[in-house]
Design a protein with these regions (language model features):
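N-terminal secretory signal peptides
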Residues: 1-22, 30-41, 49
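Acidic, metal/ion-coordinating pockets
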Residues: 51-424
Length: 424
């Protein structure tokens, strides 16, 4: 067992597919009506049998997959959180959580307990792995060139996240060696579907898919910037760089094998609550390609949720629409700005009757989160569980005149106009 293993014992647009705003009672009832999971394949992220272009992962359940008829109603629930950003104070706190400090053991799991019920109650759970797990033997490091403990992969997967991206502006922080180490680390997690960085051209060409309740999901990811670090010339395949041509090729292949295509995007201007022109360009391009959902991150702050409509090359409407969550904000981090610690968890459901036609996205909701930082204590809380007394102790939010009110007002200002249900 590695010495870095975890502890010895983180006006509103109308939804063209369905209901955009629900009462809390309706939303919770819908979220509670989760159907059994069914997952195909036995391969870890980044692994596949020789010759295949697709990678998938298996469910922990040994129950047989139920037979679904063409008239079966299918529903799959989804959640997404933002940047798992391993600033070194967060790593030091995980070291302390594990017991004796400096012994190479880390426990990040207490930091995530505020969202445990969300993760456990949804079929697909996405998290952005903002900083590379480049291999502990390269030395752990924080800002500005990160290398995070490899045990994070096991702890995050064990906590219930099963979709992650490693395509961020920090992917190249440890060079090609770090990427190859990261790919091997994530490939060992059999219930995690990772994409965004790759171990070979063959690996880059594989479309990651998983099946839930009779629907097949494809998962793609891109980053638009690597902090000025060039992609290694000998390994142009090692990370998915955003670009119209690459996206067109990947989405076209993904739609051949999946009912739903989800794209994760590392993009945006740092600390800006409004999407920039490049974000909007890529959102429209992906909408034109027929992507179902885009989940964004990178600015370290929350940004709006909007619907985009698809058009063909002649400018004619295709009749499809794409939901764009421009930025989920940070998730777990140590950034010293109030606005960088107000974040969210986006949830929705994918629904379809039978095997034909496009899945619809329903029951859109946003659970406001706060990344709490206080005297070495790091933990994510739901805003509705975040008391005034606790908010007053936050190292940055606590300096606001009304700490908890600040979190509420910022969420309302940015997410409120989107028209999604906010779970206050």
């Amino acid at each position: 067992m590695s010495a870095s293993h975890f502890a010895k014992q983180d006006s509103a647009p109308v939804n063209p597919h369905g209901t955009g705003r629900l009462s809390r009672r309706e939303f919770l009832a819908a979220s509670g009506a989760l159907l059994a999971l069914a997952c195909t394949g036995s391969l870890g992220a980044g692994q596949a049998h020789a010759g295949t272009r697709y990678a998938s992962f298996a469910s922990e359940s040994s129950e047989p997959t139920p037979t679904l008829s063409d008239e079966t109603y299918r529903r799959v629930s989804f959640s997404a959180v933002g940047d798992n950003l391993m600033n070194y104070p967060v790593v030091e706190a995980a070291d302390a959580n594990a017991g004796t400090t400096g012994d190479g053991w880390f426990d990040f799991t207490p930091m995530y307990q505020g969202v445990g019920d969300i993760v456990s109650s949804h079929d697909l759970n996405f998290i952005d792995i903002e900083t590379i797990l480049g291999g502990d033997d390269l030395g752990l490091s924080g800002y500005p060139v990160f290398n995070s403990p490899s045990c994070l992969a096991e702890q995050i997967t064990g906590y219930g996240w099963n979709l992650c991206t490693t395509a961020t502006n920090h992917t190249l922080d440890m060079g090609l060696t770090g990427i190859l180490n990261s790919c091997a680390t994530w490939a060992a997690q059999t219930n995690m579907l990772m994409t965004g960085s790759f171990s070979s051209q063959e690996d880059r060409d594989r479309i990651r898919t998983c099946e839930r309740n009779g629907m097949t999901f494809a998962f793609l990811s891109y980053a638009d910037d690597f902090n000025g670090i060039p992609i290694p010339s000998e390994a142009p395949w090692c990370v998915a760089q955003a670009g119209d041509d690459a996206m067109t090729s990947d989405v076209t292949r993904a739609k051949e094998v999946a009912d739903v295509v989800i794209v994760a995007m590392s993009w945006g201007s740092e600390y800006e609550h409004s999407p920039n022109d490049l974000q909007r360009h890529y959102a429209q391009h992906l909408a034109n390609l027929g992507v179902d959902l885009i989940v964004g991150f990178g600015p370290h702050v929350i940004q709006p949720i909007e619907w985009y409509y698809g058009y063909d090359n002649d400018g004619n409407p295709t009749g499809t629409s794409t939901l764009v969550v421009f930025s989920l904000g940070n998730f777990l981090s140590n950034q010293p700005y109030s606005y960088a610690n107000v974040e969210g968890c986006f949830t929705c459901e994918f629904e379809r009757l039978g095997t034909k036609g496009r899945a619809t996205i329903t029951n859109l909701a946003w659970t406001p989160l706060v990344n709490h930082i206080s005297s070495g204590w790091h933990q994510v809380f739901k805003l509705k569980d975040y008391t005034d007394d606790l908010a007053a102790t936050h190292e940055s939010i606590g300096l606001e005149s009304d700490p908890r009110g600040y979190c509420y007002n910022l969420t309302q200002q940015v997410i409120g106009p989107s028209g999604v249900y906010i779970d206050w």
